[in-house]
Amino acid sequence: MKLLEGKVALVTGAGRGIGKAIALRYAQEGADVAFTDLAINEAVEETTKELEAMGVKAKAYASNAANFDETHEVVKQVVEDFGRIDVLVNNAGITKDGLMMRMSEAQWDAVINVNLKSAFNFIHAVTPIMAKQRGGSIINMSSVVGVSGNAGQCNYSASKAGMIGLAKSI
């Protein structure tokens, strides 16, 4: 038996990059995979096909992870489609690098909203489900810059430090 056989994983921001790699690895271990991305595009459709080719159920959901109501609706739909959520991987993230003195409020807000607020949104939506199931795992993707900081990435560093604090507090 594979490590995650019979489990359902929800991976945010998994249309490409690290999120896609996580989704593919979970599928290799037998998990059915629900995943989100900002829009359903060619890359997302290709990821879905790759997951299904591994013999698991897979479905992509368009979601603005920074929107509280949208994330709750996506989680509701995942439960309707898959029956449960055993693993949440908060991976959705962006960068908008720049020195603090040149950074706009919009750049700050965009990174905090996608990288940190989205994790709160999805955790808020899945914890009642996991509590009812009497189990589940939540993985928050952070970065070394959440601990050390990084010049030119104060928004990104703050968002990743927030992810660490969030993980320690739930």
Feature-to-residue mapping (PLM):
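Conserved glycine-rich Rossmann-like NAD(P)H-binding loop of the short-chain dehydrogenase/reductase
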Residues: 29-46
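Active-site helix of classical SDR
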Residues: 123, 159, 167
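Residue(s) in the substrate-gating loop at a strand-loop-helix junction
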Residues: 143
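The beta1-alpha1 cofactor-binding region of Rossmann-like NAD(H)/NADP(H)-dependent oxidoreductases
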Residues: 41, 62-74, 105
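Substrate-binding pocket helix/loop in short-chain dehydrogenase/reductase
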Residues: 99-100, 107-112
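Active-site loop immediately N-terminal to the catalytic Tyr-X3-Lys motif
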Residues: 101, 148-154
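Conserved glycine-rich cofactor-binding loop
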Residues: 8, 15-17
